[in-house]
Amino acid sequence: MTYRTSLMLIAIAVCVQLASADSQTERVRALAAKNSAALSSGNYARLVELTYPKIVEMIGGRDKMIETLRRGSEDMKAHGSAILGAEVSEPKEVVTVGDRQFAILPMTVRVRVPDGTLRSTGFLIAVSEDHGKTWTFIDGAGLKEKLAQVLPEFPPQLLLPPREQPVLEPK
């Protein structure tokens, strides 16, 4: 094999790996967007399907989580608030630990409140147990204290973003 052929094969292999990584980050972002859309539209059954199973279990199961989400939404409406939407960005990296993959996806949530629109930045933790074919999600709000309990194998090189104060955009 010539030097030129070897270089070409290496270049092709690198391009394939980069394309695979790009499609993986896009796949996890697209599923995270479906997760956010389910929250915004009140499709709590779909939201529970996309939630990391241990979280669903800790809340008391599928039906209890759906009921908790429904009641929370009704309470928000009673106080003049509603979730307007959530935008999720691609993860910076996907880290593999054993058979699992992890990623952190930045997220911005907009909530209508009586005084205007509240914009809050946060993140989702994405977990795949089938090499990136499917993903489930954990809302990062208030998770730092319980991370070891929920995901004891969470990779330390993935640093959780700092919590930021919500910003009110007045009417």
Regions found by a protein language model. Give the residues of each.
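Alpha-helix boundary/capping and short turn/kink residues
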Residues: 41-44, 114
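Residue-level signal for secondary-structure boundary elements
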Residues: 40, 77-81, 162
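Alpha-helix boundary/capping residues
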Residues: 13, 51-54, 72, 154-158
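Short, low-complexity N-terminal intrinsically disordered segments enriched in polar/charged residues
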Residues: 11-12, 17-41
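Short solvent-exposed beta->alpha transition segments
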Residues: 23, 29-30, 45-102
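Compositionally biased, proline/threonine/alanine/serine-rich low-complexity intrinsically disordered stretches
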Residues: 15-18, 22-23, 67, 161-171
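Exposed beta-sheet edge and beta->alpha loop/turn motif
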Residues: 92-171
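Bacterial N-terminal signal peptides that target proteins for export
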Residues: 1-8
